[in-house]
Amino acid sequence: MSTTYNCVHYDRDLMRSCIYGLAVGDALGVPYEFRERGTFECTGMVGDGTHKQYAGTWSDDTSMALCICSSIKRLAYIDVADIAGRFRRWLERGDFTCDGHAFDVGVTCRKAISMGVPAKSYDGCGNGSLMRTAPLAMLDPIEPYNIREVSAITHAHPVAEWSCVALCDILRTIRNVGTPAKGDLWHRYGYIASRPVEAVKSDGYCEHTLEAALWCFLNTFSYTDCVLAAVNLGDDTDTTAAVAGAIAGVYYGFGAIPPKWIDQLRGKAVIDQCI
Protein backbone atom coordinates (compact mmCIF):
# COMPACT_ATOMS: atom_id res chain seq x y z
CA MET A 1 0.00 0.00 0.00
CA SER A 2 1.35 3.40 -0.93
CA THR A 3 0.98 6.82 0.57
CA THR A 4 0.37 10.05 -1.31
CA TYR A 5 2.00 12.84 0.69
CA ASN A 6 0.61 15.64 -1.46
CA CYS A 7 -1.41 17.88 0.81
CA VAL A 8 -5.15 17.81 0.12
CA HIS A 9 -7.89 20.12 1.29
CA TYR A 10 -11.67 20.27 1.12
CA ASP A 11 -14.62 22.53 1.79
CA ARG A 12 -16.17 21.29 5.04
CA ASP A 13 -19.69 22.42 4.13
CA LEU A 14 -19.51 20.51 0.86
CA MET A 15 -18.15 17.44 2.62
CA ARG A 16 -20.99 17.68 5.12
CA SER A 17 -23.55 17.73 2.29
CA CYS A 18 -21.88 14.68 0.77
CA ILE A 19 -21.59 12.64 3.96
CA TYR A 20 -24.99 13.50 5.39
CA GLY A 21 -26.55 12.84 2.00
CA LEU A 22 -24.86 9.45 1.98
CA ALA A 23 -25.67 8.61 5.62
CA VAL A 24 -29.35 9.51 5.39
CA GLY A 25 -29.72 7.42 2.23
CA ASP A 26 -27.94 4.54 3.94
CA ALA A 27 -30.18 4.76 7.02
CA LEU A 28 -33.34 4.91 4.92
CA GLY A 29 -32.30 1.75 3.09
CA VAL A 30 -31.07 -0.36 6.02
CA PRO A 31 -34.51 -1.74 7.05
CA TYR A 32 -35.33 -2.85 3.50
CA GLU A 33 -32.07 -4.46 2.40
CA PHE A 34 -32.58 -7.62 0.31
CA ARG A 35 -36.30 -6.94 -0.07
CA GLU A 36 -37.70 -7.54 -3.53
CA ARG A 37 -38.75 -4.54 -5.57
CA GLY A 38 -42.49 -3.92 -5.44
CA THR A 39 -43.02 -5.74 -2.14
CA PHE A 40 -42.64 -2.63 0.02
CA GLU A 41 -42.71 1.17 -0.15
CA CYS A 42 -40.26 3.35 1.74
CA THR A 43 -41.68 6.78 2.55
CA GLY A 44 -39.48 7.77 5.48
CA MET A 45 -37.11 6.74 8.24
CA VAL A 46 -38.17 3.56 10.04
CA GLY A 47 -36.52 0.95 12.24
CA ASP A 48 -36.51 -2.82 12.67
CA GLY A 49 -36.66 -4.53 9.27
CA THR A 50 -33.85 -6.64 7.83
CA HIS A 51 -31.17 -5.85 10.39
CA LYS A 52 -33.39 -5.15 13.42
CA GLN A 53 -31.88 -1.69 13.96
CA TYR A 54 -33.31 1.48 15.43
CA ALA A 55 -34.66 4.05 12.97
CA GLY A 56 -31.90 6.28 11.67
CA THR A 57 -29.11 3.72 12.03
CA TRP A 58 -26.55 3.75 9.23
CA SER A 59 -24.40 0.81 8.20
CA ASP A 60 -21.08 -0.13 6.61
CA ASP A 61 -21.49 2.31 3.72
CA THR A 62 -21.33 5.32 6.03
CA SER A 63 -18.85 3.80 8.48
CA MET A 64 -16.26 3.14 5.77
CA ALA A 65 -16.78 6.60 4.26
CA LEU A 66 -16.15 8.05 7.72
CA CYS A 67 -12.93 6.04 8.00
CA ILE A 68 -11.72 7.82 4.87
CA CYS A 69 -12.91 11.22 6.08
CA SER A 70 -11.31 10.90 9.49
CA SER A 71 -7.97 9.88 7.99
CA ILE A 72 -7.97 12.84 5.60
CA LYS A 73 -9.04 15.24 8.36
CA ARG A 74 -6.22 14.11 10.63
CA LEU A 75 -3.40 13.83 8.10
CA ALA A 76 -4.38 16.23 5.29
CA TYR A 77 -3.06 13.72 2.77
CA ILE A 78 -4.12 10.31 1.47
CA ASP A 79 -2.46 7.53 3.44
CA VAL A 80 -3.79 4.20 2.20
CA ALA A 81 -2.28 2.28 5.11
CA ASP A 82 -3.89 4.64 7.62
CA ILE A 83 -7.28 4.28 5.93
CA ALA A 84 -6.88 0.50 5.94
CA GLY A 85 -6.08 0.65 9.65
CA ARG A 86 -9.27 2.58 10.30
CA PHE A 87 -11.22 -0.02 8.34
CA ARG A 88 -9.79 -2.64 10.70
CA ARG A 89 -10.73 -0.59 13.77
CA TRP A 90 -14.26 -0.32 12.40
CA LEU A 91 -14.53 -4.05 11.73
CA GLU A 92 -12.84 -5.32 14.89
CA ARG A 93 -13.63 -2.63 17.48
CA GLY A 94 -16.77 -1.00 16.18
CA ASP A 95 -15.22 2.44 15.72
CA PHE A 96 -17.06 4.76 13.32
CA THR A 97 -20.45 3.21 14.09
CA CYS A 98 -23.66 4.24 15.83
CA ASP A 99 -23.58 1.57 18.54
CA GLY A 100 -20.00 0.35 18.84
CA HIS A 101 -20.27 -2.65 16.54
CA ALA A 102 -20.10 -3.22 12.80
CA PHE A 103 -23.04 -4.89 11.08
CA ASP A 104 -24.03 -5.70 7.50
CA VAL A 105 -20.37 -6.16 6.55
CA GLY A 106 -19.82 -7.42 3.02
CA VAL A 107 -17.98 -10.71 2.59
CA THR A 108 -15.32 -9.19 0.33
CA CYS A 109 -14.64 -6.28 2.67
CA ARG A 110 -14.49 -8.52 5.74
CA LYS A 111 -12.07 -10.94 4.11
CA ALA A 112 -9.82 -8.24 2.64
CA ILE A 113 -9.65 -6.24 5.87
CA SER A 114 -9.05 -9.32 8.02
CA MET A 115 -6.42 -10.84 5.73
CA GLY A 116 -4.98 -7.69 4.20
CA VAL A 117 -5.50 -9.10 0.71
CA PRO A 118 -7.87 -7.26 -1.67
CA ALA A 119 -10.15 -9.13 -4.05
CA LYS A 120 -8.92 -9.04 -7.64
CA SER A 121 -11.25 -11.64 -9.13
CA TYR A 122 -14.81 -11.18 -10.34
CA ASP A 123 -15.83 -11.48 -6.68
CA GLY A 124 -14.08 -8.15 -6.26
CA CYS A 125 -16.60 -6.40 -8.52
CA GLY A 126 -19.02 -5.81 -5.68
CA ASN A 127 -20.00 -2.33 -4.55
CA GLY A 128 -18.09 -2.40 -1.26
CA SER A 129 -15.54 0.16 -2.39
CA LEU A 130 -17.95 2.24 -4.48
CA MET A 131 -20.23 2.82 -1.48
CA ARG A 132 -17.49 4.59 0.49
CA THR A 133 -15.66 6.50 -2.22
CA ALA A 134 -17.72 9.73 -2.43
CA PRO A 135 -15.63 11.71 0.10
CA LEU A 136 -12.60 11.44 -2.17
CA ALA A 137 -14.40 13.51 -4.81
CA MET A 138 -14.50 16.44 -2.39
CA LEU A 139 -10.70 16.62 -2.14
CA ASP A 140 -8.31 18.89 -3.98
CA PRO A 141 -6.14 17.71 -5.56
CA ILE A 142 -7.32 14.19 -6.32
CA GLU A 143 -6.23 11.90 -9.15
CA PRO A 144 -7.70 8.65 -10.49
CA TYR A 145 -4.80 6.64 -9.09
CA ASN A 146 -5.61 7.93 -5.58
CA ILE A 147 -9.19 6.75 -5.95
CA ARG A 148 -8.13 3.38 -7.32
CA GLU A 149 -5.65 2.82 -4.48
CA VAL A 150 -8.31 3.45 -1.85
CA SER A 151 -10.67 1.08 -3.66
CA ALA A 152 -7.93 -1.55 -3.84
CA ILE A 153 -7.71 -1.81 -0.06
CA THR A 154 -10.60 -4.25 -0.45
CA HIS A 155 -11.59 -4.26 -4.14
CA ALA A 156 -8.69 -4.34 -6.60
CA HIS A 157 -10.58 -5.55 -9.65
CA PRO A 158 -10.32 -2.90 -12.42
CA VAL A 159 -14.11 -2.74 -12.79
CA ALA A 160 -14.50 -1.86 -9.11
CA GLU A 161 -11.65 0.64 -9.19
CA TRP A 162 -12.89 2.44 -12.30
CA SER A 163 -16.47 2.50 -11.02
CA CYS A 164 -15.13 4.49 -8.08
CA VAL A 165 -13.31 6.83 -10.46
CA ALA A 166 -16.52 7.29 -12.47
CA LEU A 167 -18.53 8.18 -9.35
CA CYS A 168 -15.91 10.73 -8.32
CA ASP A 169 -16.02 12.22 -11.81
CA ILE A 170 -19.81 12.60 -11.53
CA LEU A 171 -19.52 14.21 -8.11
CA ARG A 172 -16.76 16.57 -9.21
CA THR A 173 -18.81 17.61 -12.22
CA ILE A 174 -21.65 18.53 -9.87
CA ARG A 175 -19.29 20.21 -7.43
CA ASN A 176 -17.53 22.30 -10.06
CA VAL A 177 -20.41 23.10 -12.41
CA GLY A 178 -23.35 23.46 -10.01
CA THR A 179 -26.96 23.41 -11.22
CA PRO A 180 -26.10 23.06 -14.94
CA ALA A 181 -24.30 19.81 -14.09
CA LYS A 182 -27.54 17.86 -14.30
CA GLY A 183 -27.93 18.75 -17.97
CA ASP A 184 -24.33 17.79 -18.60
CA LEU A 185 -24.84 14.45 -16.89
CA TRP A 186 -28.04 13.87 -18.87
CA HIS A 187 -26.03 14.43 -22.04
CA ARG A 188 -23.39 11.92 -20.93
CA TYR A 189 -25.60 9.35 -19.24
CA GLY A 190 -28.98 9.74 -20.88
CA TYR A 191 -28.78 6.15 -22.06
CA ILE A 192 -28.94 5.11 -18.41
CA ALA A 193 -31.55 7.67 -17.32
CA SER A 194 -33.91 6.73 -20.16
CA ARG A 195 -34.14 3.07 -19.16
CA PRO A 196 -37.48 1.83 -17.83
CA VAL A 197 -37.33 0.99 -14.16
CA GLU A 198 -37.65 -2.70 -15.01
CA ALA A 199 -34.23 -2.50 -16.67
CA VAL A 200 -32.53 -0.90 -13.66
CA LYS A 201 -30.57 -3.41 -11.59
CA SER A 202 -30.05 -2.67 -7.90
CA ASP A 203 -27.97 -5.65 -6.82
CA GLY A 204 -24.51 -5.60 -5.23
CA TYR A 205 -22.50 -5.35 -8.47
CA CYS A 206 -20.56 -2.07 -8.58
CA GLU A 207 -21.57 -0.97 -12.08
CA HIS A 208 -25.23 -1.73 -11.41
CA THR A 209 -25.16 0.28 -8.18
CA LEU A 210 -23.59 3.29 -9.88
CA GLU A 211 -26.08 3.13 -12.75
CA ALA A 212 -29.05 2.74 -10.38
CA ALA A 213 -27.94 5.70 -8.26
CA LEU A 214 -27.42 7.84 -11.33
CA TRP A 215 -30.80 6.77 -12.73
CA CYS A 216 -32.49 7.89 -9.51
CA PHE A 217 -30.69 11.24 -9.51
CA LEU A 218 -31.41 12.05 -13.15
CA ASN A 219 -35.08 11.06 -12.94
CA THR A 220 -35.97 13.03 -9.81
CA PHE A 221 -35.93 16.68 -8.80
CA SER A 222 -35.18 16.69 -5.07
CA TYR A 223 -32.97 14.97 -2.55
CA THR A 224 -36.02 13.35 -0.96
CA ASP A 225 -37.37 11.86 -4.17
CA CYS A 226 -33.92 10.68 -5.24
CA VAL A 227 -33.15 8.63 -2.14
CA LEU A 228 -36.67 7.24 -1.80
CA ALA A 229 -36.53 6.13 -5.43
CA ALA A 230 -33.21 4.42 -4.69
CA VAL A 231 -34.53 2.52 -1.67
CA ASN A 232 -37.67 1.48 -3.52
CA LEU A 233 -35.60 -0.20 -6.23
CA GLY A 234 -35.13 -2.97 -3.68
CA ASP A 235 -32.32 -5.49 -3.13
CA ASP A 236 -29.16 -3.61 -2.03
CA THR A 237 -31.27 -0.73 -0.79
CA ASP A 238 -28.84 0.87 1.64
CA THR A 239 -25.91 1.04 -0.75
CA THR A 240 -27.93 2.23 -3.74
CA ALA A 241 -29.48 4.95 -1.57
CA ALA A 242 -26.12 5.84 -0.01
CA VAL A 243 -24.52 6.43 -3.41
CA ALA A 244 -27.60 8.24 -4.74
CA GLY A 245 -27.75 10.24 -1.51
CA ALA A 246 -24.16 11.39 -1.84
CA ILE A 247 -24.82 12.56 -5.40
CA ALA A 248 -28.06 14.32 -4.45
CA GLY A 249 -26.52 15.74 -1.29
CA VAL A 250 -23.75 17.45 -3.22
CA TYR A 251 -26.14 18.67 -5.92
CA TYR A 252 -29.00 19.96 -3.76
CA GLY A 253 -27.00 20.79 -0.63
CA PHE A 254 -27.33 19.94 3.05
CA GLY A 255 -30.36 22.20 3.42
CA ALA A 256 -32.33 20.05 0.98
CA ILE A 257 -32.18 17.01 3.24
CA PRO A 258 -35.44 16.90 5.22
CA PRO A 259 -34.77 18.23 8.75
CA LYS A 260 -36.86 15.42 10.20
CA TRP A 261 -34.51 12.87 8.69
CA ILE A 262 -31.48 14.73 10.05
CA ASP A 263 -33.12 14.72 13.48
CA GLN A 264 -33.83 10.99 13.23
CA LEU A 265 -30.33 10.14 12.02
CA ARG A 266 -28.30 8.43 14.72
CA GLY A 267 -24.59 8.86 15.35
CA LYS A 268 -24.40 12.48 14.25
CA ALA A 269 -21.61 13.18 16.77
CA VAL A 270 -19.53 10.43 15.16
CA ILE A 271 -20.16 11.88 11.71
CA ASP A 272 -19.33 15.44 12.75
CA GLN A 273 -16.05 14.37 14.38
CA CYS A 274 -14.93 12.84 11.09
CA ILE A 275 -15.71 15.74 8.76
Task: Say what each PLM segment does.
Residues 1-275:
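Structured, active/binding-site neighborhoods that engage oxygen-rich ligands
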